[in-house]
Amino acid sequence: MRFGIVARRDREAALKLAYRVYDFLKVSGYDVLVDRETFENLPEFEEGDVVPLEEFDVDFIIAIGGDGTILRIEHKTKKDFPILGINMGTLGFLTEVEPHETFFALSRLLEGDYWIDERMKLRTYLNGENSVPDALNEDAILTGVPGKIVHLKYYVDGGLADEVRSDGVIVSTPTGSTGYALSAGGPFVDPRLELFVIAPINPIALSSRPMVVPSSSEIEIVPLPPERGLILTVDGQFYTHLSPDTEIKIKKSPRKARFVRFSHEIYPRYPFRLKKRF
């Protein structure tokens, strides 16, 4: 069995815990790879075990950090590796255990006492090409000029769903429903469901409300005059500028995010995390 280790790069405690996990697994006789960016911030790992995240080929990834660390893994890895998230971040909605539970969790993982939680992702096509990472949380199409609204139409399966003047629009997965989409007035969505939430950001018309559509849908977003540049953000991690005539289509991705879980509990766990964090 081979493990990969990825840590939050700007928190010393996360890097030190990553080394303890690395040492524990090596002493236990397992092959371990370490993300190069983790190594660059704590060069105590054996250099022969260090590879870029894009080249990981492992059975499990141990992520020591927050949601941003997990999103970095999801954007850079080429396969859907199961991730055990250890919360060393601010929110930690995607993580499974707290730091003091790390080695108990590893023991359960090694004993096979876990299950895999699969989450849908969305895929974005710009002018027909899949040139950006799949989103685990959301795509946000934003005004490219601060202080200026954008005028957009969005279609679901070819039918006009809404026309908005707003700061932009969010297309979210159930996993992302506790993030940016929630701030835009979207609902909390049970992560076991597969669907899209479409949420306009600060729309002028009060009648423009978030909507929920099936995950089988194709969503097309069409900019309207006055023509201004747009910014596409994927999970708040990837950014690209779009010209006003860019064709934007969003579908369910064939890929999944996969998480190691020890509990099947959804309620009250997720609502409690929302209240606790905010």
Swiss-Prot record:
Q: Which cofactor does it need?
A: a divalent metal cation
Keyword set for this entry? ATP-binding, Cytoplasm, Kinase, NAD, NADP, Nucleotide-binding, Transferase
InterPro entries from the UniProt entry:
ATP-NAD_kinase_N, ATP-NAD_kinase_PpnK-typ_C, NAD/diacylglycerol_kinase_sf, NADK
Q: What class of enzyme is it?
A: transferase
Top-level taxon of origin: Archaea
The active-site annotation reads D67 (proton acceptor)
Q: What EC designation does it have?
A: 2.7.1.23
Output the Pfam families linked to this UniProt entry.
NAD_kinase, NAD_kinase_C
GO terms for MF: ATP binding; metal ion binding; NAD+ kinase activity
Gene3D superfamilies from the xrefs? Probable inorganic polyphosphate/atp-NAD kinase, domain 1 (3.40.50.10330), Probable inorganic polyphosphate/atp-NAD kinase, domain 2 (2.60.200.30)
GO aspect biological process, one term: NADP biosynthetic process
Catalyzed chemical reaction(s): NAD(+) + ATP = ADP + NADP(+) + H(+)
Please give an example of a GO cellular component term from this record: cytoplasm
**Binding residues annotated for NAD(+), in chain numbering:** 67-68, 72, 137-138, 148, 165, 167, 178-183, 237
Where is this protein found?
Cytoplasm
PANTHER family named in the record: BIFUNCTIONAL NADP PHOSPHATASE_NAD KINASE, NAD KINASE
Which family does this protein fall into?
Belongs to the NAD kinase family.
Tell me, what does this protein do in biology?
Involved in the regulation of the intracellular balance of NAD and NADP, and is a key enzyme in the biosynthesis of NADP. Catalyzes specifically the phosphorylation on 2'-hydroxyl of the adenosine moiety of NAD to yield NADP.
NCBIfam families tied to this protein: PRK03708.1
User: HAMAP family per the record?
Assistant: NAD_kinase
What's the name of the protein?
A: NAD kinase
| Species the sequence originates in | Thermococcus gammatolerans (strain DSM 15229 / JCM 11827 / EJ3)
